[in-house]
C-alpha cells in the first residue's frame, strides 16, 4: 500500500466516522471520569442530565458520606460506625492472638456515650470527633447577625494580641 492509498483510506475512514456520528444520535463516547469505575456517557447535550450526579432536582444521597467517590476515611470514622459496639471475643480467639496484639493493641473499648450528637454546621460536620484543643465551634454568621452583640467576648481561635504568648525582644 503506497502513501497515497493510505491517505485516501484514512480520509474515507474519517468520512465514515463522521457519517455515523451525524446519522446515529446514540453515537458518542464513553468518558471514564477517574479510577473508580465511573463512566459518563456523552451521547448528546441532554444525556448527561439523566446520569447519576448531574440530576439536581432529586434527593439522591443528600449529603451522605458516599457522595464522594473513594471516601473510605470518612466512612470509617463516621459516627454510625464508631458507635456500633465491637463484636464479643470468640472462645477460640486466643489461638489467633499474636504477640504484637498482646503488646500494643490492649486498649480498652471506648464508651459510646461520649459520642453524643453536638450541634453541627452542615450535614456532614461531626464536631464530636474534633479533639478539645482544636474545637472552636463559635457562633455561625447567622447566629451572629441575629443575636445581641457581645463586645467583651474574645474567641480563643482568633488571634488576640493580649493573649499572645510570644514576648517581643
Curated annotation (Swiss-Prot):
What is one Gene Ontology biological process annotated in the Swiss-Prot or TrEMBL record? flagellated sperm motility
Sequence segments annotated as region (Mn 1)? 98-109
Q: What cellular-component terms does GO give this entry?
A: axonemal A tubule inner sheath; axoneme; cilium; nucleus; sperm flagellum
- A Pfam family that the UniProt record links to this protein: CFAP68
Superkingdom = Eukaryota
Compartments, record wording? Cytoplasm, Cytoskeleton, Cilium axoneme; Cytoplasm, Cytoskeleton, Flagellum axoneme; Nucleus; Cell projection, Cilium
Coiled coil location = none
Keyword Transport in record: no
Q: Cystine bridges: which residues?
A: none
Sorted alphabetically, the keyword list is:
Cell projection, Cilium, Cytoplasm, Cytoskeleton, Flagellum, Nucleus
Major place of residence: cytoplasm
InterPro entries linked to this entry: CFAP68 (IPR009524), CFAP68/107 (IPR037662)
Instruction: Write out the similarity annotation.
Output: Belongs to the CFAP68 family.
Q: Which PANTHER family match?
A: CILIA- AND FLAGELLA-ASSOCIATED PROTEIN 107-RELATED (PTHR31180), EXPRESSED SEQUENCE EH456644 (PTHR31180:SF3)
**What does the record note on quaternary structure?**
Microtubule inner protein component of sperm flagellar doublet microtubules.
Q: What's this protein's function? A: Microtubule inner protein (MIP) part of the dynein-decorated doublet microtubules (DMTs) in cilia axoneme, which is required for motile cilia beating.
Record protein name field: Cilia- and flagella-associated protein 68
Species for this entry: Bos taurus
Q: Which gene is annotated as encoding this protein in its UniProt record?
A: CFAP68
Amino acid at each position: 500500500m503506497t502513501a497515497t492509498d493510505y491517505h485516501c483510506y484514512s480520509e474515507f475512514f474519517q468520512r465514515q466516522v463522521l457519517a455515523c456520528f451525524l446519522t446515529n444520535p446514540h453515537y458518542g463516547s464513553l468518558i471514564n471520569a477517574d479510577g473508580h469505575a465511573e463512566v459518563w456517557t456523552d451521547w448528546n447535550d441532554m444525556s448527561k442530565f439523566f446520569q447519576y450526579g448531574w440530576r439536581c432536582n432529586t434527593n439522591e444521597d443528600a449529603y451522605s458520606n458516599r457522595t464522594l467517590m473513594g471516601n473510605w476515611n470518612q466512612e470509617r470514622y463516621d459516627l454510625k460506625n464508631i458507635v456500633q459496639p465491637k463484636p464479643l471475643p470468640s472462645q477460640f480467639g486466643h489461638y489467633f492472638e499474636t504477640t504484637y496484639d498482646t503488646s500494643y493493641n490492649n486498649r480498652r473499648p471506648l464508651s459510646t456515650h461520649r459520642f453524643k450528637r453536638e450541634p453541627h454546621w452542615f450535614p456532614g460536620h461531626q464536631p464530636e470527633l474534633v479533639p478539645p484543643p482544636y474545637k472552636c465551634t463559635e457562633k455561625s454568621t447567622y447566629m451572629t447577625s441575629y443575636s445581641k452583640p457581645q463586645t467583651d467576648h474574645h474567641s480563643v481561635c482568633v488571634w488576640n494580641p493580649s493573649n499572645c504568648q510570644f514576648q517581643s525582644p
